[in-house]
């Protein structure tokens, strides 16, 4: 899915604003090297033989495009003091501030990674990877995830290019979000800012405490906005939902709605969700004793939950003033009751790779119809 496209509507929305230039001193080359994971993909031979300046330009250009600044240009240079500076044209002068905040938070992640390595817990195939290249201004919702897969850094050099984010972007489009706008809903905070092999989840469980300062600062910076409602957040997967409970108090179940306070006096709505990739495991017949019907039933159940969570995220992102509980109840009714046949068809189309006609026929069979009767999961709310 091409996530850098900017819709005409978004471009028009920004065209009426008075733009100028944003300038930011990113720090000395040593600092920028570690915060931008430079070089991203070199092992004697570089997959992309970019300089440090080209690497920074790449990620900052991703950000300005995802913020809707279609005409903005990014120039990165190094001065005589070996400081790396960025000039971004046709954006508000204030545009530099969220970037500065992100990199300052990144220093906390670097400090945590350094301690982790000192304690002998850093793996040879891990990379410190901050959430670079995402929208800095045009944020609609926050996604709290576990860790980025290594190929997002080494191959794609795009934090939003992964099977996980691609699938969730698709679910957002099923809930009325234009494909060009999904990056605004997918501002990611990973509790382990480590690009690692997809199989490394268990190994990363002992790393979270090293990044506590980074994690809590990022959640606060990303969700809270001056003079506006906090952005809604979705917590994906069991490790992340457990982290929310340990850090903020309330237990977060799948489709469980809670409220956290990243800062005194603030309340951020948080919805628990499955990990976006969990459905492929749940719907694998090798995990149900070879029983295909049982695997399909498990996948259908999870598809209903995932569509409900994406619906809530889309609705709250469009209107942060909407009632979190009412939005969740409406979404659950839609995808698990009134439109459960569509939920079924989307499951067979996207997970089983059926054609629309094949999916429609499958959803009319007796075994699937019986599974759909049990699709509804009670909504758990703790506010």
Predicted features by range, described:
Residues 23-232, 238-245, 274-281:
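A polyanion-binding, active-site-adjacent surface
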Residues 23-77, 81-82, 204-213, 245-382:
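C-terminal capping/extension of enzyme domains
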Residues 15-17:
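N-terminal signal peptide c-region/cleavage motif recognized by signal peptidases
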């Amino acid at each position: 899915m091409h996530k850098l496209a900017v819709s005409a509507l978004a471009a028009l929305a920004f065209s009426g604003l008075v733009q100028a230039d944003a300038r930011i001193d990113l720090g000395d080359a040593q600092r920028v090297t570690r915060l931008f994971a430079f070089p991203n993909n070199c092992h004697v031979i570089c997959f992309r033989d970019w300089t440090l300046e080209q690497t920074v330009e790449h990620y900052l250009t991703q950000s300005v495009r995802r913020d809707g600044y279609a005409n903005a240009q990014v120039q990165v240079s190094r001065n005589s003091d070996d400081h790396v500076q960025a000039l971004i044209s046709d954006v508000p002068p204030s545009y530099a501030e969220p970037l500065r905040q992100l990199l300052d938070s990144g220093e906390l992640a670097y400090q945590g990674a350094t301690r982790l390595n000192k304690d002998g817990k850093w793996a040879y195939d891990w990379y410190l990877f901050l959430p670079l290249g995402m929208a800095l201004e045009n944020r609609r919702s926050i996604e709290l995830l576990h860790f980025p897969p290594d190929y997002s850094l080494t191959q794609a050099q795009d934090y939003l290019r992964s099977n996980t984010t691609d699938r969730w972007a698709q679910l957002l489009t099923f809930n009325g979000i234009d494909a060009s706008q999904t990056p605004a809903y997918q501002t990611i905070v990973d509790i382990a800012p480590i690009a690692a092999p997809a199989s490394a989840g268990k190994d990363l469980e002992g790393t979270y405490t090293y990044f506590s300062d980074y994690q809590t600062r990022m959640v606060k910076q990303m969700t809270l906005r001056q003079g506006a409602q906090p952005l809604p957040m979705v917590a994906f997967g069991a490790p992340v939902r457990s982290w929310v409970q340990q850090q903020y108090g309330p237990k977060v179940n799948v489709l469980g709605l809670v409220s956290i306070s990243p800062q005194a006096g603030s309340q951020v709505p948080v919805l628990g969700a499955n990990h976006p990739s969990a459905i492929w495991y749940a719907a694998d017949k090798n995990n149900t004793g070879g029983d295909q019907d049982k695997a399909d039933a498990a996948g259908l159940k999870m598809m209903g939950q995932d569509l409900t969570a994406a619906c809530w995220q889309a609705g709250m992102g469009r209107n942060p003033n909407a009632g979190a509980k009412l939005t969740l109840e409406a979404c659950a009714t839609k995808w698990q009751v009134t439109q459960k046949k569509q939920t079924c068809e989307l499951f067979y189309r996207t997970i089983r790779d059926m054609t629309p006609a094949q999916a429609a026929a499958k959803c009319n069979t007796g075994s699937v119809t019986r599974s759909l009767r049990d699709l509804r999961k009670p909504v758990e709310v703790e506010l």
